[in-house]
């Protein structure tokens, strides 16, 4: 018997290779597993999904990083794109992204599972009060701390989160009640997601199984959604 809060490639591999039974096997999904967390997003901000092409899982790591630094970040470096939060699920990716931010001399603060409480409070305060352009945030930190970060006007998912509820929870932080009134215009807000075909299980949790399949089989590499429906 395998029990997990979320589907993942590692468990799928064990299931397919090692879980054999002459009477067969059964897989049960939790209630709402087909709907996707996007149905729980209540803010009016459009969600833009960018598909990155890669021929292997190993290649996808560098392809994602290259797409992020060369295709996504040039737009968010503009002065009009202050209050940008970059959410990074993997700590190894987080370190790589943080090192790139340092070498590029970008104005940022960071919150991770290894950050001290004093540093976290300082980083959040500077981000909210326009003193830092970017905030780097890790998935593991959010899993344990569940910070309701204020001041986010632009949210970048470096990779879809492991847990679907994180996708809707973080996206809903763009609501007006979490904003600094002096931080910018309500018309200048965005949610960006970078994904590859190897993120299929994570994508399903975010947008639902049917929509995820359509996204991966589509000729278009860019998809725009409003909360609850695709454009």
Give the role of each language-model region.
Residues 1-31:
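Post-DEXD/H (motif II) to motif III coupling segment of the RecA-like Helicase ATP-binding lobe
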Residues 83, 93-99, 105-144:
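Conserved helicase ATPase core of P-loop NTP-dependent helicases/translocases
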Residues 2-4, 172-228:
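Conserved segment of the helicase C-terminal RecA-like domain
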Residues 14-15, 29-106, 203-207:
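Conserved interdomain hinge at the start of the Helicase C-terminal
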Residues 4-6, 56-59, 87-91, 112-115, ...:
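Structural motif
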Residues 81, 106, 150-153, 186-191:
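Short glycine-/polar-rich loops that comprise or flank the Walker A/P-loop
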Residues 132-133, 137-183:
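Conserved RecA-like helicase motor core of SF1/SF2 enzymes
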Residues 10-11, 95, 144-148, 163-167, ...:
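Switch/connector loops and helix/strand junctions flanking conserved nucleotide-binding motifs
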């Amino acid at each position: 018997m395998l029990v997990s809060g979320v589907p993942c490639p590692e468990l799928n591999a064990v299931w397919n290779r090692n879980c054999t039974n002459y009477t067969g096997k059964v897989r049960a999904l939790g209630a709402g597993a087909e709907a996707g967390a996007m149905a729980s997003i209540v803010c009016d901000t459009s969600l833009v999904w960018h598909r990155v092409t890669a021929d292997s899982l190993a290649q996808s790591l560098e392809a994602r990083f290259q797409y992020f630094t060369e295709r996504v970040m040039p737009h968010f470096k503009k002065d009009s794109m202050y209050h940008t939060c970059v959410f990074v699920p993997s700590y190894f990716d987080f370190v790589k992204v943080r090192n790139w931010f340092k070498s590029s001399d970008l104005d940022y603060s960071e919150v991770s599972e290894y950050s001290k409480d004093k540093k976290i409070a300082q980083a959040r305060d500077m981000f909210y009060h326009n003193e830092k352009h970017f905030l780097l945030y890790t998935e593991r930190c959010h899993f344990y701390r569940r910070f309701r970060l204020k001041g986010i006007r632009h949210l970048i998912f470096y990779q879809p989160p492991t847990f679907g509820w994180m996708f809707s929870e973080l996206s809903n932080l763009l609501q007006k009640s979490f904003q600094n009134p002096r931080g910018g215009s309500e018309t200048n807000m965005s949610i960006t997601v970078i994904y590859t075909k190897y993120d299929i299980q994570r994508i399903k949790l975010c947008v639902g199984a049917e929509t995820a399949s359509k996204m991966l089989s589509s000729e278009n590499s860019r998809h725009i959604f409003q909360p609850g429906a695709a454009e």
